[in-house]
Amino acid sequence: MYDVRHVLRKAGLRSTYSGYNYLASAVALVLKDQEFYLKNVTSNLYRVVGEQYGVSNMCVEAAIRTLINSYWNQNSNKILSPLLGYPVFDKPTASEFISMLADYIQDHSSR
């Protein structure tokens, strides 16, 4: 199994953002049960991550969004597209980003 934080670092994400830990936890949860957690991201995924860290689901979402915005403004798709192996033209939403990273880890952990 791939280490989620290793993949986040490989993608160029900075651990200085609180959203980094929330994102790592969110991706790990999605790897356990993608259908459940991605069905209703706010009330399923962000709620559980928020409970782990003692914050609200809105705080989790905002922190992950801030991390993605900063990442995208600095890197655009220069790192993400080559890492994933397909072009990413537009900034992904938080749930899309989580899904992309989880898919990448699933694809590469089975090799």
Question: What feature does the model see in each segment?
Answer:
Residues 19, 60-63:
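Helical mechanochemical/support elements of P-loop NTPase systems and associated helical scaffolds
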Residues 48-50:
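Short alpha-helical "recognition helix" segments of helix-turn-helix
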Residues 53, 62-65, 72-111:
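C-terminal engagement/docking regions of AAA+ P-loop ATPases
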